[in-house]
């Protein structure tokens, strides 16, 4: 009998910069890989070309204080979603690194950002990971940069 365990985990670095480019806040946070996210990985490995689900392409931020759960399928209070600025696959460490930036007026009002997720569509879609964190107060002129690492081990 084969007995191999494949675990997925993730962590992200969030940096908030003011309109002047000065660093206002920086955090390192862990996340939950969702059940739908794990199913997405399995489908990417085993589906025929026409049925392969879309690649992860978006990151979203929101304002809910609801803790993450593997059964989550969306952010609870999404405020903005942006296309990933980069996706890097590391051959040596079984990691994928996703990056996104939420610039001025993204979202278009000041918010206390408390949650984030990675998705494979610009609306709805499969959520690979979700995290909740203490509030990061993003003003309309601020830029929020998120670098999210997901590892299979």
Annotate each PLM feature.
Residues 1-114, 121-153:
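Small cysteine-rich, disulfide-bonded extracellular modules of the LU/uPAR three-finger superfamily
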């Amino acid at each position: 009998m084969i007995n191999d365990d494949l675990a997925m985990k993730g962590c992200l670095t969030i940096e908030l910069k003011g309109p002047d480019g000065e660093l206002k806040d920086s955090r390192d946070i862990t996340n939950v890989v969702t059940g739908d996210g794990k199913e997405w990985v399995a489908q990417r490995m085993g589906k025929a070309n026409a049925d392969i689900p879309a690649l992860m392409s978006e990151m979203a931020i929101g304002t809910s204080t609801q803790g993450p759960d593997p059964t989550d399928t969306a952010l609870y209070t999404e405020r903005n979603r942006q296309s990933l600025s980069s996706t890097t696959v590391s051959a040596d460490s079984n990691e994928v690194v996703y990056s996104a930036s939420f610039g001025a007026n993204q979202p278009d009002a000041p918010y206390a950002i408390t949650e984030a997720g990675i998705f494979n569509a610009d609306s709805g879609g499969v959520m690979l990971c979700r995290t909740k964190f203490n509030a990061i107060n993003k003003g309309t002129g601020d830029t929020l940069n998120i670098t999210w690492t997901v590892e299979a081990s």
